[in-house]
Amino acid sequence: MSDIQLNTLKPAEGAKHAKRRVGRGIGSGLGKTAGRGHKGQKSRSGGFHKVGFEGGQMPLQRRLPKRGFTPLGQHLYAEVRLSDLQALPVDEIDVQTLKAAGVVGQAVRYAKVIKSGELSRKVTLKGLTATAGARAAIEAAGGSLA
């Protein structure tokens, strides 16, 4: 192992290839047509179809029906787990606290606590809603929803 040194490292034989230099004379083997063949759309500069083009046939993206939509207010609502509340260092929790801790995004206006994970300490929720199971878990730990 002592033979290997940083200044003696070389790539394996055949691992490196010279860059193809096309259109640089007959002797290179890639002169004249530069590997593009003769005539036709693909031989010309800028000559290629757009993505999804199927030669005039109705493209798949237009053959299939439109489906579904994204609700405009989707980013306004967020779900928060009990385990997320357990990890927070504060006892009074509202949407601003959740944003500051990075639990929910900055665009969120309303958050709902769901029963996922464990809560073993007393927390007070302000301006948040909760599922029935989450509410029971919060109250069992001595917490409340204001």
Swiss-Prot record:
Record's keyword terms, sorted: Ribonucleoprotein, Ribosomal protein, RNA-binding, rRNA-binding
Matches recorded under InterPro entries: Ribosomal_uL15, Ribosomal_uL15/eL18, Ribosomal_uL15/eL18_sf, Ribosomal_uL15_bac-type
UniProt entry tagged with the keyword RNA-binding: yes
GO CC annotation terms, alphabetical: cytosolic large ribosomal subunit
Highest taxon of the lineage: Bacteria
Biased composition (Gly residues): 24-34
Coiled-coil segments: none
GO BP, one annotated term: translation
Keyword Ribosomal protein: yes
Residue numbers spanned by region Disordered: 1-65
GO function term, MF aspect, one: rRNA binding
HAMAP family (alphabetical): Ribosomal_uL15
Complex and partners: Part of the 50S ribosomal subunit.
Similarity section: Belongs to the universal ribosomal protein uL15 family.
Protein name: Large ribosomal subunit protein uL15
Lineage: Bacteria, Pseudomonadati, Pseudomonadota, Betaproteobacteria, Burkholderiales
UniProt gene name: rplO
